[in-house]
């Protein structure tokens, strides 16, 4: 019975979101990171091959160069690029020559040494992250994304930009698949862009590239009144300012919009549109999931919180209905409980807004209130 109820609940939840995908790949059933693949396909960055996306295949270095060129220039301009002058193992007639040379010229890639690029080699999350950071505006030399300490410096900026969000099981040093690359690119679209007043110069000491004389990277900003596209994907307001960060997706795709919504159970969801056409609506992944009554203190610990959250910043829904003002602050060691047996509890934590949403779904058919002895008639 429990298995049956779980299957029914899963079916109902999946039907609560209607997704119109632009990525009509024949192997779409194999795609786990559907939101990322759909959005990046809709804007023309991914196109697949022979009608397939091949989500589990490792991303190669030359494929990554093509993705970045498509992202920054658009397909038509990127396909018009010519190359073959930067690396000895990327001939002018190789399909990826234009993309590779473009990325090398703009500082997105630097090769593997000895004048080579290794175009068919695989790519780690850290290496692809460095490419995306340059797309966001970070200067590779100024930020130390080259040289002996490039991995440490790249990892720090990737964490700040949340480039691995949704890829909790992926280590930065691991080779990434095509769908994982799509997820990283989706995260980049939602990350703020940066700029420099001056970039300065660099010196190399014991293999470490050190930037000198340059200014620090600052967020590219705009006011809502000056740039309405700032509301399309992100709207992070700077402290004590009327300025808002401009995310990469807003910079590159003015018709791409991201709106927060919810499904029938009031689970937070994301709706993407392009030129007013819906790409899809996707339920957010909960930060925590429980199937029994859970102490507030446990949730506090499992979220890794260091400060409490006021009950005023907590919202609770039960079977899609607002449950009223939440009764408890989210504090360390609290023994107050939320959820219960037979209740699926999803916890959504917004670390930027410092809010928590509890979504509870009753998975039982009925509740036994009394038991009677068996009788015969």
Model-found features: residue ranges?
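Solvent-exposed hydroxyl-ligand-binding patches built from regularly spaced Ser/Thr
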Residues: 229-377
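Extracytoplasmic, non-cytosolic globular domains
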Residues: 184-187
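Feature responds to low-complexity, polar/acidic, surface-exposed segments characteristic
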Residues: 1-34, 43-97, 106-126, 133-175, ...
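Extracellular interaction modules
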Residues: 95-96, 174-178, 339-340, 352
């Amino acid at each position: 019975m429990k298995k049956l109820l779980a299957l029914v609940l899963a079916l109902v939840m999946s039907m609560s979101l209607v997704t119109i995908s632009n990525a009509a790949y024949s192997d779409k059933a194999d795609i786990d990171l559907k939101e990322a693949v759909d959005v990046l396909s809709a804007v023309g960055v991914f196109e697949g091959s022979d009608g397939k996306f091949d989500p589990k295949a490792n991303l190669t270095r030359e494929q990554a160069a093509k993705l970045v060129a498509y992202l920054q220039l658009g397909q038509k301009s990127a396909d018009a690029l010519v190359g073959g002058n930067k690396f000895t193992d990327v001939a002018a007639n190789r399909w990826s020559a234009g993309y590779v040379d473009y990325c090398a010229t703009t500082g997105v890639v630097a090769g593997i040494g000895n004048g080579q690029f290794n175009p068919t080699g695989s790519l780690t999350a850290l290496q692809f992250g460095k490419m995306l950071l340059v797309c966001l505006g970070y200067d590779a030399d100024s930020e130390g994304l080259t040289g002996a300490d490039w991995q440490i410096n790249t990892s720090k900026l990737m964490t700040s930009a949340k480039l691995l969000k949704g890829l909790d099981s992926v280590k930065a040093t691991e080779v990434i698949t095509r769908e994982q690359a799509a997820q990283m690119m989706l995260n980049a679209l939602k990350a703020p862009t940066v700029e420099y007043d001056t970039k300065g110069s660099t010196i190399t000491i014991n293999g470490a590239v050190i930037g000198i004389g340059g200014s620090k990277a600052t967020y590219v900003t705009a006011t809502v009144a000056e740039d309405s596209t700032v509301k399309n994907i992100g709207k992070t307001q700077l402290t004590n300012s009327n300025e808002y960060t401009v995310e990469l997706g807003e910079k590159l795709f003015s018709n791409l919009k991201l709106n927060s919504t919810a499904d029938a159970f009031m689970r937070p969801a994301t709706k993407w549109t392009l030129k007013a056409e819906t790409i899809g609506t996707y339920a957010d992944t909960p930060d925590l999931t429980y199937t029994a009554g859970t102490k507030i203190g446990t949730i506090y610990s499992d979220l890794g919180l260091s400060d409490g959250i006021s009950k005023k910043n907590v919202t609770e829904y039960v079977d899609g209905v607002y449950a009223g003002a939440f009764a408890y602050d989210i504090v360390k060691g609290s023994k107050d409980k939320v959820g219960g047996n037979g209740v699926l509890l999803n916890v959504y934590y917004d670390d930027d807004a410092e809010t928590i949403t509890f979504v509870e779904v009753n998975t039982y058919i009925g509740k036994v209130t009394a038991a009677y002895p068996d009788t015969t008639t």
